[in-house]
């Protein structure tokens, strides 16, 4: 199946109104199109970016869900993620002049990790850009930052460029793990396309975008159905996944999986104060492009080589580091701060991502202050486990 550049999956049929179908829960948080299914399963729900989302399900919780993805397959509702479309003559060139990465490096049908920065180099959001054509780019920002990203792109858009907030026009279901191809294949969906590419397909006569992307470090896919079609697709996937020893997974497992890979989380490891240079995301910056938001500030910071940098921390004994814990060197001097920390179900020990001074070298032993208790840790380069995405 080829890539459809002008089809019905991303975007709307002419004259069709934008959908605003998201529901409000009783406590004012937004809910996904799969909310009632999570409640029926007994999921533990919590606020995530202003959305009431499943953190874990009964029957094992985070560790079992994490292990299912690493060893077999799991499925996540990530419909809280934003969706936006930039279209019109030269839309890709416009996006390329705003966001950090270089869309010129990829062809239509491919996706690219990129960042939206402010003029001081701070990260407004990190997102995935799906290049449909020179005149059509689909974006997946983070839930809490979607409106801000859309507003910024709308404010600078030249005449003829349309920027649409389609947050609730689509659901997103991630199927991740070594058996993900088998699961999708059993539904008649396309599999086997290159990592960071996407195919426009149909399931039961309904449009769905099959993206070879994910946030777990495992081989997998992210499916983008229309909002109202997410439920039936989820139900069918659940049967196929359960038959193969997998399970629905909450955002708790998604967080431990991404931390093991060293993938940054906006608000923790990337922020208005933590730039791409500091976060180890300079690879997602098109330094040779003539312009992008924050280029001057980031170029200066990159050349100065004085900022803190993201490093991994592997805890030697028992204990779990958490965000904002202070990191000290052997002399007791403060040399950094944890930005993300968790227990690694794969390694069965504490791990963390931290912003550390450049004087701290790989292999050094440091101490993490966790509520007055010192945890010894080794400085390492993420990922903490092998990458299996391809």
Language-model region placement:
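N-terminal amphipathic/basic-hydrophobic helices that include classical n-h-c signal peptides
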Residues: 1-23
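Acidic, proline/glycine-enriched N-terminal capping motif
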Residues: 18-114, 122
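Conserved, structured C-terminal
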Residues: 20-49, 53-57, 65, 130-390
């Amino acid at each position: 199946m080829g890539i459809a550049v002008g089809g019905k999956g991303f975007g709307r049929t002419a004259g069709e109104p934008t959908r605003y179908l998201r529901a409000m829960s009783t406590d004012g948080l937004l809910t996904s199109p799969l909310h009632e299914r999570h409640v029926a399963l007994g999921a533990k729900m919590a606020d995530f970016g202003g959305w009431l989302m499943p953190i874990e399900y009964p029957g094992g919780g985070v560790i079992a869900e994490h292990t299912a993805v690493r060893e077999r397959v799991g499925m996540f509702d990530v419909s809280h993620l934003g969706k936006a479309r930039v279209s019109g003559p030269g839309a890709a060139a416009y996006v390329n002049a705003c966001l950090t990465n270089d869309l010129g490096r990829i062809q239509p049908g491919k996706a690219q990790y990129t960042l939206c920065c402010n003029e001081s180099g701070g990260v407004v959001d990190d997102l995935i850009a799906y290049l449909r054509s020179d005149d059509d780019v689909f974006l997946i920002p983070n839930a809490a930052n979607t409106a801000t990203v859309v507003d910024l792109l709308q404010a600078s858009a030249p005449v003829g460029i349309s920027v649409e907030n389609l947050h609730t026009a689509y659901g997103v279901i991630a199927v991740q793990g070594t058996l993900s191809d088998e699961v999708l294949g059993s539904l008649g969906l396309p599999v086997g396309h290159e990592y960071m590419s996407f195919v426009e397909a149909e399931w039961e006569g309904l449009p769905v975008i099959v993206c070879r992307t994910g946030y777990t470090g495992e081989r997998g896919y992210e499916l983008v159905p229309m909002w109202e079609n997410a439920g039936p697709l989820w139900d069918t996937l659940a049967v196929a996944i359960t038959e193969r020893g997998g399970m629905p997974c909450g955002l708790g497992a998604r967080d431990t999986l991404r931390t093991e890979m060293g993938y940054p989380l906006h608000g923790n490891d990337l922020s208005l104060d933590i730039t791409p240079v500091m976060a180890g995301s300079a690879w997602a910056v098109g330094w040779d492009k003539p312009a992008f938001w924050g280029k001057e500030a980031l170029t200066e910071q990159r050349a100065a080589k004085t900022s803190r940098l993201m490093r991994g921390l592997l805890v030697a004994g028992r204990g779990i580091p958490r965000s904002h814990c202070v990191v000290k060197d052997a002399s007791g001097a403060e040399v950094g701060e944890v930005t993300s920390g968790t227990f690694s179900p794969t390694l069965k020990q504490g791990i963390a991502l931290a912003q550390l001074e450049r004087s701290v070298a790989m292999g050094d032993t440091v101490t993490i202050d966790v509520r007055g208790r010192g945890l010894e840790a080794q400085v390492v380069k993420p990922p903490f486990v092998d990458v299996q995405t391809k």
